[in-house]
Every structure is written in C-alpha cells, then in structure tokens.
Amino acid sequence: MESTTNPQGKTACLVTFGCQMNKADSERMAGALTHLGYRIVDESDTADLVLFNTCTIRDNAEQKVYSYLGQQARRKQRDPHITLVLAGCVAQQEGEKLLRRVPELDLVMGPQHVNRLSDLLERVAEGEQVVATEPIEILEDITKPRRDSAVTAWANIIYGCNEGCTYCIVPSVRGREQSRTPEAIKAEICELGASGYKEVTLLGQNIDAYGRDIGTNLASLLRFIHNAPGIERLRFATSHPRYFSDELIATCAELPKVCEHFHIPFQSGDNEVLRRMARGYTHEKYRAIIEKIRAILPDAAISADLIVGFPGETEAQFENSLRLVDELEFDALNTAAYSPRPGTPAARWPGQLDDEVKQDRLQRTNRLVAQKAFERSQRYLGRTEQVLVEETNPRDRSQVVGRTRTNRLVFFAGELAKLRGQLVDVQITAARAFSLTGTAS
C-alpha cells in the first residue's frame, strides 16, 4: 500500500485510550512511525495513517473506540490509500473478528506486538491484511519512543498480569507477566537522564510483582537504578496490595529519589466482595499496608482505585467501602461503576445491579472523595514544596504547572522557557482538592 511502502512525508495520528501503559505503548509506536518517516500529527481526519490504541477495561471506552473507528472506516471507503491500525486490548480481545466488523482495517495488533509495528506495517505494504494477536515473548525496545513530555517519562518494566480478578479482562488481553531485565531498564533510564529527563515513572499492570519470573523484585530494582545520572525523581505504578511488602516500603523510605506517592488500588472495602473479586487480601490487610507506609513516610500521598456496584454488592457492603475511604483519607481516588466485561467470570454472575443503583453509589463516593482530598490538601498551606516544572498552565499562560514529590499539581507564575525541567521551591498559598497554587520562593 502506498501509505506504508513510502511513508516519507506522510502523516500519522495516534489516538490513545486508557491507562498509562497504553500511553507508554503509544509513545513507542510513535517512535517507530517517526523512524519510518512519518510525521506525527494530532488531526486524525487528514492523516495518512491512523492508529487507535485501545482499552477494554470498561464498556464505554470500547464503544468510543468503535465510534471513532467507524468514522475512519467511512473515510477510507472514500480514500483507499489511508492505513488503519487498531492496537491495544480491544484488538487483542477481538482479533480476526474485527476484520469482519470493520473490513477497512489494515492491521490488528495486540499489546505484546507493540515493538513489532514496523515489521507488521511492511506486511501491510505488501498487500496483506494483518492480525497479530498470538502470544509472544515481548521484544526488548529497539526503537526510541517519541515521548510526549521533555521532562517526565514512562518506562515499562513488566508486561502482563498473572492475577485472576473476576471482573478484569487484562490478563487475557495483555498476557502473562514478563519482566524486563534490570540491565535493560537501567540502560533506558540512564539514556533518559542523558537526554535531559528529570523524572521516570516505572510502569506495570502489577508493578510490585516485578521480577517474580526472573529471580528479583521491585525493591532490588529500585536500588539498582537509583544512581542513574540526571534523574531526580522515580515513581512506580500500579501496585497490588498482595505484593506491597515491608521491604518495598523500607526501600522507598531509604532511597531519596523515590517519591512519596503510591498508587495502590483496593477496589472494595468489604471482605466478601474482595473474596468474590479474587483480590487475595482483606480490607484489614490493605489498611495495615497504608498504616505502615504512613508510619515510615508520614507525608506520603496515597491514591487508589475503587469499583462500586460489583455484582451482588449490598448497601451495607458498599458502605464498608465508603467507611474505608472516609477513614484512610486518600489524596486521590479513581472510582468506577462496575462494567461487565465479556469473558470474565463476574459478567456471568447473578445479582447484576441496575445502572441507577451503580450511578447513585458512584456519585455518593465521588462526593466523599472530593471532600477528603480537599481536607488532605490543606496540610500544604504555608509550606514550601519542591515542584518539578513540566508545562504552561493551559488556562493561564502567565503560569507554569508542575508536581510535588507527592504528585500534587502546583500552579505558579513563571516562564516555561526558563523553568521547564527545573526543581523550584514554591510556597503554597491556596489548596484545592486536587491541585495547589503558590509563589516561587
């Protein structure tokens, strides 16, 4: 096909749905396309190649993908030279069925094939309609990602998931856990430091399960990469309570580059719901982890995920989740109404709740979350916080925005050209639920 045999001067648009893992995958695919000669653009309606990197965690995200894809399919009917690619978790889940649903697609590829994009496009160029969803050993990164930020970067350290949560489709679409070697990870992070990046977030579906397949663990990796030149801050996400060990907590407290922010989903505050979710811990175990973190790192920020309206969840069980939110006082909480995913055990269970019930519980939860986050934010007032400047405030061009070590957004007056990538001491003068305002010291 013309758009892939000679991509020089042609344009490509990547539309990304879902989690940080997907965003990191899109950066790598954008790097591959740039290496091939494509110019990355934001406008999908005029691009020569359009790639959708998809999410299947919830039904509304999946339906949004099909809506966008339908628009591009109609466009391709008018202009056959366009190349259409569907990547990510929807591609992995649906596979060849997508070609029957959207015959205009040129390439369907699962998350494990991200680093093979260039090779797969060569097959498309030869006239083949390609489906790449078979399980493979994930190739080590061979193409430099085209990163969206010049200050902060993501680095995947473990792919896949070995858990069996009854509501979750991720293990079947991202495969079994595959850890990258510590040496490969450190090489990538050292390269980021040499390129001027200041902060790296290590990524994995269950990041604290890192190394189980290669005889190491996340605490050891953090110690191994900690001295990477140029890198000022390290973060990691997303953690599973089952693997958040005392050793990991102690290591985070010991290493000055590791930020005091931990994202540890709990999903429910009721033990019976947790059992049916197959999460592998109790709410008491979860509370103990948070207590240990705050005992060693009193100012640590904790964020989490919560699902309301799981099949069979009673009002009393939901109130147990509210009680946990109230008592643990999270700095941020991602909330979602349960969405049945085809192929998961919970989707087939009786006791599916009405949407009205789920939405009512979601709204009640979100009101409490905002209240608690606002209360937590007040501790910053009058303090001086070190802020890593990332970009201009899109709502006020006279301000820049960055993040504290605890991942709070901070807005203050300044010029991005002078401050981007700098660590600036900012005195906090106003505190909202999820952001702060201050004055540079």
UniProtKB/Swiss-Prot annotation:
Residues noted as binding [4Fe-4S] cluster 2 in the record, renumbered to the chain: C161, C165, C168
Gene3D superfamilies to which the protein is assigned, alphabetical: Methylthiotransferase, N-terminal domain, tm_1862 like domain
Needed co-factor(s): [4Fe-4S] cluster
Gene Ontology CC annotations of this record: cytoplasm
MTTase N-terminal domain span: 10-126
Keyword terms, alphabetized: 4Fe-4S, Cytoplasm, Iron, Iron-sulfur, Metal-binding, S-adenosyl-L-methionine, Transferase, tRNA processing
Cofactor note: Binds 2 [4Fe-4S] clusters. One cluster is coordinated with 3 cysteines and an exchangeable S-adenosyl-L-methionine.
Subcellular location: Cytoplasm
GO molecular function (one): metal ion binding
Subunit (UniProt): Monomer.
Name of protein: tRNA-2-methylthio-N(6)-dimethylallyladenosine synthase
